[in-house]
Each structure stands twice: as C-alpha cells, then as structure tokens.
C-alpha cells in the first residue's frame, strides 16, 4: 500500500503550518476571568432622544457610536431616529449644511438602507463644467466624509464615481500636511475604506484615533474600551471552543496536506457577526468554514481524479455507508462532516429550524460538484472559456455555501431566507463575483507556479487577447460594479431583514480585508491577518 501511495502523483501545495499552534486551546486565566468592570451606563444615550437636540449633533453622535463599535447597544433607537430624520426630507442645499455634514448624513442614511439621492445634494460643490471645486482641497474633513460616502454608491451614480476619483487624489496629496489624528484617519481610510472594512477592526482603529480628539467624550471613550475588551473575552472563549474541537478531530495529523487555519476561520466568522447574540452562529460558521477548507484542499492539492469521483458521489449521497467506498485517508473527515451536521440538525430542531441544515447540505453538495469540475480541468490541463469558468467558479469561491451556513445559528433567519439564497438572488451573485475575482487576482501567481492553467485571469486573457494587467484591471471593475449592486440591494424596502442582508455584506468585507494588497491572507496569514488576529483576540485595549 505504501509503495502504491508513493507512486501516486499528487498536486501537493505544501501549505505552511498554523501560526498559532495550541495558543488558543490553552484557555488561560485572562480569557476565563470575568473582569469586575464597573460597566458604565452610557448616559449620553439621552442625547439620541433628547428634545431640542439638533439633528446635526444627533447624527454626529450616531456616527461616533458606530465607528467606536458600540452602536449595537442602541440599535433600535438609532433605527427609529434615522427613520424620523429621513422622513424630514431635509433640504441639504441649504448653505447651513457643509460638505462634511451632508456627506456624513448621506452615508449614514445609505448604511441603514434609506434611499437618499446623491445628484441633488452634492451638485453645489461642482462648477459649471461638472467638476468638483478645487477649493475643496482645503476642507480635509469634508473631503474625507465625501470619500467615505462615495463607497455607498450604486450603478449610474456618476457624481459619486467622480467624487471618489477627486477625493482619492486630493486626500493623497494633502495627507502628509495634515495634523493627527486627522492625518492618521485619512491615511488609514485610503488603505482600508470604511464601508468595505471589518467593523471590529475599524472599531479598534477608531478608538485609538478618538482618544486623540480634543472634543472627545471621555465617558463614551471609556465605555467603548470596556465594551471592546468584554467582547474580546467572549470571542476568546469561543475561539478556545472551536480550537479544542479542531484539536480533538485531529484532522491536521490525519490530513497533513490541508491548510490548518481554524483560527483564521474564526476570524472570518467574527467578521460576519461580532455582537454577543451571535455567539452560537460564530461557532457554527467557523466549523463549516474549517471543514470546507479541508474539502477545498482535497480537490485542489491532493486527491486523484478516481478518488475525487468517489468522494463527490459520497457527498451527494450523504450516507455513512458511503465510507466503505472512500479512500482510507478521507474516511475520518467524511464521518466528522456527517456528525457535525447531525449535531446542527439536532440543535436547530429544538427551535423548529432543522430545515436550515437541509439548505446548507444541498449548498455543500453544489460546492463539491463544482470543486470536482475544477479538479478535472486541472488534471486534464483544460482552460475553459471565461463564461464557462465563471459559472463554475462563482460556486467554488465558497461564498454561496458560507452565506447559507452563516444563517444556521441566526434564530431570526427563516425558511424564506434560505429559499431566497438557494435561488441565487442579485445580492448574492454580486457577493460571489467580488469573492471570485478578488481571490483570482490574489492567487494567480501561486496557482500559475503550481501549473494551474484553469484560472480566471488566464481564461479572460485568452478570450479577450488581454495582458495580465488588463485582466486584473477588468476584475477590479467587476468587483466595484458588484459592490454597487450590493449597495442597491441593501436599500429599503426589502422582503428580508437587515439581519440577513448584513451577513452577505459582512462576508464581502472579509474578502476585502483578507486579500488586501492582492495578498492571499488566508493561505499565508503572516503578513495580512496575523496583526488583526492579535489585535482582536490577544491584546486587550489599555483602559
């Protein structure tokens, strides 16, 4: 058997080991201790509802609460206030409203799904030729606010396309001459756009900026720090739970060809939802992502076509009896996968939601079928036309499956939501496009070095007679247009709750963070994800 195995030519990728070892399995005292915080009641919440408070002041407070990562405590109050303000139909052409105020209000309304138009309210900052006034370069706060607002644009909103180009160039030119904390905020925004960022990472960054504000609210700052640390302790305990589960499965030893990335998987899940009420959902999603990663590597970096034929059939039949036919190395994984979903079904049945596991399993079967197609392309040296490639690759990007499994632990997600996702709605397809093309850009060179020719970049280059640089430019255009579609689909009215829509949005934000700088931060987390993981799960904020 050993000799036969040695003769099998496998497409091994030689992935680097985990950066973390057993660090998060050791549930040290810091993670277990419940600090006896004198947990501050943030009394300035009264500002949100106080009679006579100016709309501008209330909107600025809402923006600060959201940036500090504590707005979830006041979610219902904020929604009610924004609806009331939106219903006022404020005339933003009034000279009383400066660029900073108008752009901030526009962004906040759009972030919460309100259909505020852009052409009417930003027009007064353009000249007779339709160009933004050069004098705006003296208004750094206004430029930054407009820059951030432009990322909430939808298709056809050319004024925001132009605003993004103008503010990006202007902020880059003036940033070196600004004073902190504004300079730091501008420099960070140019690297990581607020709307595309992981809310938890952005909160930690803004807390450090807010500390430098001359007009900061000291009680609010302390509240944000305490809240961050308390949530961090919860996240560390969850990470301990999934790390222990992963260790007990022992798949790292049994399947050494696969990536050992359970910590990074939890980072992804935390990016989808960080609030306390999603604790169960985070754990469930982490487990499904970790198992998917094993499947991905089995198809991409180990299995022979004969083995993958059998494994694909076994997933399709979803029966423990299929283990008898499977190659020995994959049997423990198959058994663990079935048992995981049995546990999910048993738990969700208690709340009348066992149907959710059916949708997740069917989505996984679809994913595995597409992995199988991709593996055959690789083994056969086949480069499909771009349209054929993309149809399959939108599934193998895994986000269709992960969007479905992200709702497993969300009690408010009902059958209609899962049915909606199963039909590949516009918002989901937009998310799949972002994931696919950004992943393709980041992994192109590595896959090329491994002899993989069936890549999106290669397919597009051949079909369009394009250079690599032209293909990459096109892929970024596809992603930008897809973001516009997501922004549109987040607008009200929607038959689906914000609770569901935000899962799709946050999954796309994880892509932007993970593949920042065209790096594959999941496969090689040292440069991109490691600093974030330390900030989120290791180092508390000093009070």
From Swiss-Prot:
Pathway: Secondary metabolite biosynthesis; terpenoid biosynthesis. GO terms for cellular component: chloroplast. It is found in: Plastid, Chloroplast. One of its GO terms (molecular function) is lyase activity. Mg(2+) 2 binds at residues 296, 300. Barely detectable in leaves. Mg(2+) 1 binds at residues 296, 300. Keywords: Chloroplast, Lyase, Magnesium, Metal-binding, Plastid. A motif (DDXXD motif) lies at residues 296-300. Its cofactor is Mg(2+); Mn(2+). Sesquiterpene synthase involved in the biosynthesis of volatile compounds widely used in aromatherapy and folk medicine, and present in culinary herbs. Mediates the conversion of (2E,6E)-farnesyl diphosphate (FPP) into germacrene A and beta-elemene. Not able to use (2E)-geranyl diphosphate (GPP) as substrate. This is Germacrene A synthase. The lineage of its organism: Eukaryota, Viridiplantae, Streptophyta, Embryophyta, Tracheophyta.
């Amino acid at each position: 058997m050993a000799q036969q195995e040695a003769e099998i030519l496998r497409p091994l990728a030689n992935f680097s080991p985990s950066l973390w070892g057993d660090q998060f399995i050791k549930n040290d005292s810091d993670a277990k201790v419940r600090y006896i915080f004198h947990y501050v009641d943030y009394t300035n919440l009264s500002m949100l509802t106080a009679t006579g408070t100016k709309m501008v002041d209330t909107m600025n407070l809402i923006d600060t609460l959201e940036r500090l990562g504590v707005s979830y405590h006041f979610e219902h109050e904020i929604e009610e206030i924004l609806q009331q303000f939106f219903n006022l139909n404020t005339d933003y052409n009034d000279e009383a409203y400066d660029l900073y105020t108008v752009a901030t209000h526009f962004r906040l309304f759009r972030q919460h799904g309100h259909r505020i138009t852009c052409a009417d309210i930003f027009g007064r900052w353009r000249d007779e030729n339709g160009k933004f006034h050069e004098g705006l370069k003296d208004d750094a706060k206004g430029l930054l606010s407009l820059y951030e607002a432009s990322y909430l644009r939808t298709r056809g909103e050319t004024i925001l396309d132009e605003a993004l180009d103008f503010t990006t160039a202007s902020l880059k030119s003036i940033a070196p001459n600004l004073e902190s904390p504004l300079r730091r905020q501008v420099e960070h925004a140019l690297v990581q756009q607020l709307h595309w960022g992981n809310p938890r990472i952005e909160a930690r960054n803004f807390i450090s900026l807010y500390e430098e504000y001359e007009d900061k609210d000291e009680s609010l700052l302390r509240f944000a720090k305490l809240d961050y640390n308390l949530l961090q302790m919860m996240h560390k305990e969850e990470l301990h739970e999934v790390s222990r589960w992963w260790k007990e499965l022992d798949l790292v030893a049994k399947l050494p060809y696969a990536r050992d990335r359970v910590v990074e998987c939890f980072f992804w899940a935390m990016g989808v939802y960080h609030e306390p009420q999603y604790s169960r959902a985070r754990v469930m999603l982490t487990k499904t992502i970790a198992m998917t990663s094993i499947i991905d590597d089995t198809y991409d970096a180990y299995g022979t076509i004969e083995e993958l034929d059998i494994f694909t059939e076994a997933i399709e039949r979803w029966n423990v009896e299929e283990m008898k036919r499977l190659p020995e190395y994959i049997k423990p994984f198959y058994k663990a996968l079935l048992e995981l979903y049995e546990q999910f079904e048993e738990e969700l049945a208690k709340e009348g939601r066992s149907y959710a596991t059916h949708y997740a399993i069917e989505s996984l079967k679809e994913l595995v079928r597409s992995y199988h197609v991709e593996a055959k392309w690789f083994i056969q040296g086949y480069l499909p036309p771009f349209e054929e490639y993309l149809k399959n690759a939108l599934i193998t990007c895994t986000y269709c499956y992960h969007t479905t499994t992200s709702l497993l632990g969300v009690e408010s997600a009902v059958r209609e939501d899962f049915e909606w996702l199963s039909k590949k709605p516009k918002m989901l397809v937009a998310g799949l496009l972002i994931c696919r093309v950004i992943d393709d850009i980041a992994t192109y060179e590595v896959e090329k070095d491994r002899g993989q020719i069936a890549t999106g970049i290669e397919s597009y280059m051949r079909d369009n007679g394009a250079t690599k640089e032209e293909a990459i430019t096109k892929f970024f255009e596809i992603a930008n247009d897809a973001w516009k579609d997501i922004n549109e689909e987040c607008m009200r009215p929607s038959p689906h709750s914000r609770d569901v829509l935000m899962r799709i949005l946050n999954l796309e934000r994880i892509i932007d963070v993970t593949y920042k700088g065209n790096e594959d931060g999941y496969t090689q987390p040292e440069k991109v994800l490691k600093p974030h993981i330390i900030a989120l799960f290791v180092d508390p904020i000093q009070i």
